[in-house]
Each structure stands twice: as structure tokens, then as C-alpha cells.
Amino acid sequence: MTVTVRFAPSPTGYIHIGNTRTALSNWLYASKNNGKFILRYDDTDVERSKDEYAQAIAVDLDWLGVRPDRVEYQSKRFDIYAKAVEKLKTAGLLYACYETADELERRRKFRLARRLPPVYGREALKLTDAEKAALEAEGRKPHWRFLLPNFESDPFATQRTEVHWDDLVRGPQTVDLASMSDPILVREDGTYLYTLPSVVDDIDMGVTHIIRGDDHVTNTGVQISIFKALGATPPVFGHHNLLTTISGEGLSKRTGALSVGSLREAGYEPMAVASLAILIGTSESVTAAPDMAALAEHFDLASISKSSAKFDPSELDALNRSLLHEMPFEKAKPRLEALGICGAKAESFWLAVRGNLDRFSDVSHWWQVVSGDLPEAPDLSGEDRDFVRHAFDLLPPEPWNGQTWKSWTEAVKSATGRKGKNLFMPLRLALTGQAHGPELADLLVLVGLERTKSRRP
């Protein structure tokens, strides 16, 4: 058996960090088991689904390193769903209902007032053909419900009917079908709700494992019943915890909250996003994995907490810095070249500045410092200006090396009596225009004698 998983986003908005958790969980599970990953667009809602969102999802996944083995669109598979509908109708497992939303709401309130569970009472099963014809003559069109197998022979005498599965994340799970309403699978206009196309596609595409958010736990009992009604063996299920904002609010792709695209545009490294999306809310320590192979080593569905996890952007900042600070030159080289940073000193430059980067784009500033003019003249007081002028008069001749800074500052200390911060800070400001930054012993060599002299105040 080839492990086959799927990520099935609706292209009705941009995917966010919570969706990323699901996509990466499936991708990593398939990767660890030599399996296949299907990207399946749940675009049956023709009105709200947009091609621009589908394209954006593909771009976001590719940026994260997720490359599907197969891409499918549910909007191209309506004929397959229609055949499944007919199969269920023929088996007497899909029945027509004519209630309006208002009528259903009144019935729900009626049951609640009598302390009864607010489940659908299957009143439509009592309709005669003549009554159905009369309702349709009024202009009503039926929606179609799946008859849950929660009875022996009389559908109005429901009984406790447990559906069990061994969840990859949550362990043994049980839901009672008697506590649920028969789900609507087909709307009045003939369009499909999520459930039926999802099950039909999972069967048709050979999906063996479904890994998704724990907001789908209750749905699983219904879906297992539909799998069996269609003559298929249900796949293995795993329900991971959900991510929330730091304040505990749910994430929504329609509001753009923490969208993958916005994180990319903000300059975060894809592996920083992937590492936090996967490791937060688990028993694993949240560390930055340099690549997907390393992240896969820390990925374990059994380590996921059953409680929701809060996504803290400050943790993302820390992971991003960690990745940049440890990034080898060979990995950074193509990106540096794309920014025009190349030549004999590119490697020593990268090794000098990487420990001070929050975003990769910060390298452009430091390249300007070592290769061009300072963006702004350093703000030095009169006393510090005189000190720096004196210090620059003591600059040693080239060639310079890693010891030049030490020998120069020792000479300056002897000549001026300054030491510590009073010595180093004015020199840093004069050389870089910044109060903080990479080690000056490394930068001085990169700046070189002539450029250093040109910065004499």
C-alpha cells in the first residue's frame, strides 16, 4: 500500500499559518512514509472560489517546499459526484427534504424548549409522493440528506450507534451517530456541500490517511458512514490541534490573518514558518529546522498536544534569526548574488554579518556599509569627532587582517587614554553609521583603508 494523503483547501481566500500546519503535516507524513501528496482544490462553491486564490495557494506551498505529486480540482469532477448521489439514492440512503431554513429553525427551538437534542427528526421520510409533488408545485426544490445508520429497522427509533477509529493524534475516538442530524449532502440548487465530494474523491484517489484539524473530529463519524455506504474502506484519520492568534482567536483566511503570503512579503524564511507551524503545540522543542528533511526528523503526530496552540509572531522572529545566523555561505550565495553581492569578499562578508540579520534583506544595508557610502553622516559630538579624527590618523597601512582592529584600537587607547565604550562606540558610529552591528574586527577588513579614511569626520 502506498501512503496517499491530501491537502484540500478551498480557494476562497489566502491560506494562513493554520492551513500551513495541515498542509505540512500531510506533506511530512507522506515524505516519511515514501508516500504521495495530493493538492485538491475544494472549489465546488463556484461563486466564492477564485482562480487567483488557487494560484496563490500553489505559490505559497511551493515557497514552503511543498510540491504535490498530483493536483485536482473538484469543480471538474461533478459527474463523478452525481454517480455517487444516484448510488446512495438507489440504496435508500439519500432522501429528499423540503423544509425551509425558517422551518428547520422553528423545529430546532421546539426541541430545545422540550429539552430534546436539536437533531433533525426525519420528518421528510414520512412524505408521500403526492405530498412531495404538492411541495414541488409550490416551487420548492428538495435538498438531500444522508440517512445515518443509527437505527435497526425503524428510522424514527434511533439508538446509540458508536463509530470508532484509532486517531493518529488523539488515540481511540468514539462518536455516537444518534446524537447527530442526518447531514445534508446536496443543496436545493443541486450543488454539493463539502462532505460528499470529499469522501468520493478520497475513495477515487486512493487516499489512505486523512490528516486535518480537530474541528473535523465530529464529522469523522458521518464520513466513515458514507465511506461504508459507498462500499469503501475508510482511511486512517488524524486530527491535529488548531492554531490560534496570541489572544486566542481563531485564524481566518478571509481576513488575511497571518497569511502565508504576508509572512513571505515580511521577509520571513520559509523554514522559519514551517518549523513553527509544525512544532508549536507539540512535545518537541520549537527550533528552526534548516530544511524539510531536518524538520521531518522532528515531526511526530503522536507528539501533538490535544489543546490548541497559540501562534506567537515573536517566536517566528527568533526562529528566523536562528536560521540566518547559522546559514552557510553556499546556501546564501545565490540569494546574495541576486542582490549584487558577489566577488572575492562575498563569503567573508556573509560570515561577518549573518549573526546580525533579522531578515535576509538586511544584508543590503551592510553591503552598502562595506562597499559604498554611508546612508547618513554619523551623529558625533564635538569631543567624539575630535577623538575619531585622531584615531583615524593612527590607522595602520594595509594589508589588513583579523588582527588589525585590535592593534589599531590598542594604539588609539595608548594615544588618547580612552577605553571601553568611550573608545569603541565613536569608532563604530564613524565606520558604520550604526550604534550596533557585526564585529568591527571583521567589518574593518571589509571596508578597507581607503574607504575608512573617507569616513573621517
Swiss-Prot record:
Self-association and partners: Monomer.
Species assigned in the record: Brucella abortus (strain 2308)
Name of this protein: Glutamate--tRNA ligase 1
CDD domains, alphabetized: GluRS_core
GO molecular function, one term: ATP binding
Pfam families cross-referenced by the UniProt entry: Anticodon_2, tRNA-synt_1c
Keyword Membrane annotated: no
HAMAP family: Glu_tRNA_synth_type1 (MF_00022)
Catalytic reaction annotation: tRNA(Glu) + L-glutamate + ATP = L-glutamyl-tRNA(Glu) + AMP + diphosphate
Motif placement: 'HIGH' region: 9-19
